[in-house]
Amino acid sequence: MSQVMSSPLLAGGHAVSLAPCDEPRRTLHPAPSPSLPPQCSYYTTEGWGAQALMAPVPCMGPPGRLQQAPQVEAKATCFLPSPGEKALGTPEDLDSYIDFSLESLNQMILELDPTFQLLPPGTGGSQAELAQSTMSMRKKEESEALDIKYIEVTSARSRCHDGPQHCSSPSVTPPFGSLRSGGLLLSRDVPRETRSSSESLIFSGNQGRGHQRPLPPSEGLSPRPPNSPSISIPCMGSKASSPHGLGSPLVASPRLEKRLGGLAPQRGSRISVLSASPVSDVSYMFGSSQSLLHSSNSSHQSSSRSLESPANSSSSLHSLGSVSLCTRPSDFQAPRNPTLTMGQPRTPHSPPLAKEHASSCPPSITNSMVDIPIVLINGCPEPGSSPPQRTPGHQNSVQPGAASPSNPCPATRSNSQTLSDAPFTTCPEGPARDMQPTMKFVMDTSKYWFKPNITREQAIELLRKEEPGAFVIRDSSSYRGSFGLALKVQEVPASAQSRPGEDSNDLIRHFLIESSAKGVHLKGADEEPYFGSLSAFVCQHSIMALALPCKLTIPQRELGGADGASDSTDSPASCQKKSAGCHTLYLSSVSVETLTGALAVQKAISTTFERDILPTPTVVHFKVTEQGITLTDVQRKVFFRRHYPLTTLRFCGMDPEQRKWQKYCKPSWIFGFVAKSQTEPQENVCHLFAEYDMVQPASQVIGLVTALLQDAERM
């Protein structure tokens, strides 16, 4: 016949089964601690049982050491039969089981552990000290096969004094023993809406070695165990009546936090313990690095802060929202001891609290208990939960004082609040990011860098006195529909060849921006992407040079100190520093022998109209500079490029008879210039043109050529 002995020697009233060898062995599920409320009961897969009842079940495993050892002398306690069975034994039989001397107890200890050293007589050691040491060794042995996950949840209606760091609330002592997998300690006869005074959630499993440590005899003799620091779990399902909306504490032993440096590599394992009772020294912590609320140094700081107030029975640092969301900037700093966080990822804050219990307790548990965020089942996160990810905006700094008592973190306002609502305040990434131009700024300053009507020489003149990076974009004279980019660089490449009349030390480089259905693209640069507009092209190249020799500098004023598009012919000096250009229709070239002036232009136009077949016009770019006139065939049909030096020019003007050329059913003015023949030095050739676009009138180029010829005659 098996008997049950419950003794204070077993640290908190844990039950042990002593079975004779001639009878079938029976083991009992552990009874809850006497500190639990009377309405609590223990639920297993076999059904509900009263709190005080112990139901024997068959034990299939090998007998434990305590079952084979002699009985222990202790105070007799009451024995509770299971329902439907009679009381086991008589008082005389019970006395025979527990009536042992001190020598018998010492003999039993030596059989359990031959290395155990007995206390000498007369040192004041008591029988309780020896029994406590025996129990410590027993707990150490059982920790190899027992893994209990215990979550202690207390009500939000806790007594708070002097802010959130001094919150005391009733605690629940976890039962010790081998619980069945899936065992759940719930409260009955209490509505689910109000069931938040003191509740516990227990998960048991045999998945690895626990982190239990034997209790030293000195600590076991203390009349009252030390206060355990705690980390609060917010009661999301109920309204908090405390001033700061504190949740229930998640208790952890101080001795565990001292060992965090040694246990840090084990956080990634499946061993998961969550709480510790003041009665027993079973310390718990999270078993997955993805669910850690703090790093090791943060836990050490919280432990030191909690030990400063020993008057409270269960100190609470902050609520979960304050811990995970309102983290101080010091928590993001690297720990002083590198071994505390070695072998595990750093998790500055907890994962977000998702809606519909996506990353919290299962619905069956949540319906009967408060919402516990990020519950780990057997040390692993729930399916669907992802590790916390920090956005780049949150990596720089956090506003100090976000978790001050006067401004508590609003993490416990609603069940569906996530980290996106947390009061994170990000600092700008630096002056470099603030100075990066925006599309609006680029478009607003386009009047300074986009000059469609200027020529290549004008662009060079505008950028000659500017700093490296200055640029200007104009319409390309060689490729119709494309754009020319003039950019001032710091040094001229060795392969660059100087154009006629240009300085070899010129720092202005020219690039072609092609335009197509895909967008604008820098010609010859395959690594360059296509941009939807010139503004996008300029904005991107002002941030990153890409294929250009340097980044573009957005101008905020007129380049060259004046409006380079104005082509005034008031003085010869101003004409020498300017150039003009436009698109025109090239008609033909007619030899006028020795004629010059307006008569030569009149004769050439008359000869052209007298032909049976009129010439086919070609679009060319007419450019006038100090060096002369340069013609560029846009379509490359008649010629590629022709240059007429200023010394060969004789006259440039409109038709004296003001005749017009019919272009696409629209008349356009005809003009021409007279130059020496390149084959016959004694003859002159008149080159005829017609205006191509009303926006680009021929009067500008005609006036500039006339002014240049006048200056050449004076010289």
Swiss-Prot record:
The record's account of how the chain is modified after translation: Proteolytically cleaved by caspase-3 during apoptosis.
Phenotype when changing residue 506 to A: No effect on cleavage by caspase-3
Signal peptide region: 1-18
Cross-referenced Pfam families: PTB, SH2
GO biological process assignments: protein localization
Spans annotated as Disordered: 159-183, 195-251, 291-364, 376-435
Feature: compositional bias, Low complexity: 291-325
Effect on the protein upon substituting residue 650 to A: Abolishes interaction with ITGB1. Does not affect interaction with CBL following EGF stimulation
Ranges of biased composition (kind: Polar residues): 197-206
SUPFAM superfamilies listed in its UniProt record: PH domain-like, SH2 domain
Annotated site (Cleavage): 570-571
Residues bearing PTM Phosphoserine: 82, 248
GO cellular component: cytoskeleton; cytosol; focal adhesion
Keyword tags: Actin-binding, Cell junction, Cytoplasm, Cytoskeleton, Phosphoprotein, SH2 domain, Signal
GO molecular function term, any single one: actin binding
Family: Belongs to the PTEN phosphatase protein family.
Subunit structure as annotated in this protein's UniProt entry: Interacts (via SH2 domain) with Rho GTPase-activating protein DLC1 (via C-terminus); the interaction is independent of DLC1 tyrosine phosphorylation. Interacts with integrin ITGB1; the interaction displaces tensin TNS3 from the ITGB1 cytoplasmic tail and promotes ITGB1 stability. Interacts (via SH2 domain) with E3 ubiquitin-protein ligase CBL (phosphorylated on 'Tyr-774'); the interaction is enhanced in the presence of EGF and reduces interaction of CBL with EGFR.
Function: Promotes EGF-induced cell migration by displacing tensin TNS3 from the cytoplasmic tail of integrin ITGB1 which results in dissociation of TNS3 from focal adhesions, disassembly of actin stress fibers and initiation of cell migration. Suppresses ligand-induced degradation of EGFR by reducing EGFR ubiquitination in the presence of EGF. Increases MET protein stability by inhibiting MET endocytosis and subsequent lysosomal degradation which leads to increased cell survival, proliferation and migration.
Name of protein: Tensin-4
Gene encoding the protein: TNS4
